[in-house]
């Protein structure tokens, strides 16, 4: 459940920082003029994977491996990886690559500015629940996909997030 809340908070953050980035939408059969809009944000996958080209521009945030560990003498920590997939459309190849780079860079820069996402508490104050983890081995990576996909351009970014610690509520009794 906690990773679902992270995805929801990441979606809200992404929608806020991308709301003024207006990109071309692929023209569909029957369209008479080019439409433009901000990238839509989805969680885990597109609602209909067969419509990947029709949905561009978009960003998908997807949780990948979750790990919980506890080193001797230190607090338990849970880290989740999030793969963010970016996709845009542009009939001009140079503009398409630049639009993709712009989407990915805006997300990366805004994320590095705050390094946390969260929600609003019952008192109306902003609460940060999730911290970006840039510890050794958890670097922020971004890769534009190479390949002949024009006029669609895609790339991905991997981020790591520290989740709140789950508190043990029951004592463990071992059989003897």
Regions of interest found by a model, annotated:
Residues 53, 74-78, 99, 147-153:
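A generic structural micro-feature
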Residues 62-91:
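Active-site-adjacent structural patch at catalytic or cofactor/ligand-binding sites
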Residues 84-85, 90-108:
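Long, charged/polar, surface-exposed segments that mediate recognition or autoinhibition
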Residues 1-72, 174-176:
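Small/polar-rich, solvent-exposed N-terminal microdomains that initiate assembly or binding
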Residues 68-72, 89-95, 163-172:
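Short, cysteine-centered beta-strand-loop-beta hairpins and adjacent loop/turn segments enriched
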Residues 59, 80-82, 155-159:
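Hydrophobic residues positioned within well-ordered beta-strands of beta-sheet architectures
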Residues 48, 67-75, 137-149:
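Catalytic micro-motifs at enzyme active sites that drive phosphoryl/nucleotidyl and oxygen chemistry
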Residues 101-168, 176:
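Acidic-leaning, charged glycine-interspersed low-complexity segments
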């Amino acid at each position: 459940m906690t990773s679902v809340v992270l995805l929801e908070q990441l979606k809200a953050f992404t929608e806020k920082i991308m709301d003024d980035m207006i990109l071309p939408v692929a023209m569909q059969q029957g369209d008479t003029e080019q439409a433009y809009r901000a990238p839509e944000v989805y969680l885990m996958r597109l609602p209909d994977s067969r419509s990947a080209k029709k949905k561009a521009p978009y960003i998908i945030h997807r949780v990948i491996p979750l790990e919980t560990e506890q080193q001797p003498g230190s607090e338990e920590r849970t880290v989740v990886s999030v793969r963010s997939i970016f996709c845009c459309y542009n009939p001009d190849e140079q503009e398409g690559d630049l639009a993709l780079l712009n989407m990915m860079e805006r997300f990366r820069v805004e994320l590095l500015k705050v390094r946390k996402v969260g929600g609003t508490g019952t008192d109306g104050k902003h609460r940060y629940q999730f911290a970006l983890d840039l510890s050794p081995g958890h670097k922020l990576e971004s890769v534009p996909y190479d390949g002949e996909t024009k006029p669609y351009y895609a790339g991905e970014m991997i981020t790591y997030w520290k989740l709140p610690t789950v508190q043990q509520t029951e004592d463990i009794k071992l059989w003897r």
